[in-house]
Amino acid sequence: MKNTADITVLGAGSYGTALAISLASNGHRTMLWGHEPEHIENLKNDKSNEAFLPGIPLPDLLIPEADLATALAASNNVLVVVPSHVFGLVLSQAKPLLRKDSRIVWATKGLEPETGRLIQDVAREVLGDEYPLAVLSGPTFAKELAAGMPTAISIAGTDPQFTKDLVELLHSPKRLRVYANDDFIGLQLGGAVKNVIAIGAGLSDGIGFGANARTALITRGLVELTRLGEAMGAQASTFMGMAGLGDLVLTCTDNQSRNRRFGLALGKGSDVEAAQEEIGQVVEGYRNTKEVYTLAKRLGVEMPITEQVYQVLYKGKSPVDAAKELLSREQKSETSSAE
């Protein structure tokens, strides 16, 4: 019993720990692996993740584990919650240690750095077609989820039984509502693009624009997300759900969002390096911006907001000039195929 679990979570940061807390609170024996032994030892001793979620106790059914082989042997259900730029590396380390009956789900939001490939493509490249895959996405702040505040997410996967099992594992009447979705591509894309738009919303607020401008950015950002999604074979309806509109509104409007705070700092005059230092944790949207920009260019999809956020982050353009360029774009119908 000691070395078995209902699910193993890879990634002991804020979101991985929050999901592990939710699973364990739901009565599931949950093993939580992290790559830093000292951090895992602190979790065991403190019975909380003071580095990322201070003051929130770890349930008795949550077992911190520093050894990857032990963690992966414990369960056939593996939930990967690591930043997108190390997803492939962690999966490569895990591959020789996986059980034959392993099933892989991730909560990583982003695309592969440099190439702009979906996480599913990275997973298939590393693992082949041997294992069922799934993704969970939606409007979630780790602190609220860990504290037991009501949250809703969506799950999509390559195997209907795996998706069904994940819904049953994660769903909790008191804290977490889980929706099954059949749009594997759409759920992955929403989690990446919303980070870019959230930086844009932060930039807008940082330079002194108000709620009107922020709302316009969210609305047109949803248009950009939908346009890119359809070009990749996703369903437009997905982006009106948890992984699209839901995640977009949450990330663009609340200062718990690192991406929004990053944009705010830039809008108020900080450079990229100083803004990242101010946040103190990984800002996924910084890399996501380059990834989404690369993908959009490759597919020939027009994404003006993404373009301007990219120019600010990677080309040194001032936030004010980026805003001016967006506002001075040629007038078009709101419902036309291009902005």
From Swiss-Prot:
InterPro entries: 6-PGluconate_DH-like_C_sf (IPR008927), 6PGD_dom2 (IPR013328), G3P_DH_NAD-dep (IPR006168), G3P_DH_NAD-dep_C (IPR006109), G3P_DH_NAD-dep_N (IPR011128), NAD(P)-bd_dom_sf (IPR036291). GO terms for cellular component: cytosol. Pathway: Membrane lipid metabolism; glycerophospholipid metabolism. Its EC number is 1.1.1.94. The active site is at residue 194. Gene3D superfamilies: N-(1-d-carboxylethyl)-l-norvaline Dehydrogenase, domain 2, NAD(P)-binding Rossmann-like Domain. This is Glycerol-3-phosphate dehydrogenase [NAD(P)+]. It is found in: Cytoplasm. One of its GO terms (molecular function) is NAD binding. Keywords: Cytoplasm, Lipid biosynthesis, Lipid metabolism, NAD, NADP, Nucleotide-binding, Oxidoreductase, Phospholipid biosynthesis, Phospholipid metabolism. One of its GO terms (biological process) is glycerol-3-phosphate biosynthetic process. It holds the Pfam family NAD_Gly3P_dh_C. Belongs to the NAD-dependent glycerol-3-phosphate dehydrogenase family. The lineage of its organism: Bacteria, Pseudomonadati, Pseudomonadota, Gammaproteobacteria, Alteromonadales. Catalyzes the reduction of the glycolytic intermediate dihydroxyacetone phosphate (DHAP) to sn-glycerol 3-phosphate (G3P), the key precursor for phospholipid synthesis. NADPH binds at residues 14-15, 35, 109, 142, 258, 282, 284. Sn-glycerol 3-phosphate binds at residues 109, 138, 140, 194, 247, 257-259. The keyword Lipid biosynthesis applies. HAMAP family: NAD_Glyc3P_dehydrog (MF_00394). It is an enzyme of class 1 (oxidoreductase). Its main location: cytoplasm. The keyword Ribonucleoprotein does not apply. It catalyses: sn-glycerol 3-phosphate + NAD(+) = dihydroxyacetone phosphate + NADH + H(+); sn-glycerol 3-phosphate + NADP(+) = dihydroxyacetone phosphate + NADPH + H(+).
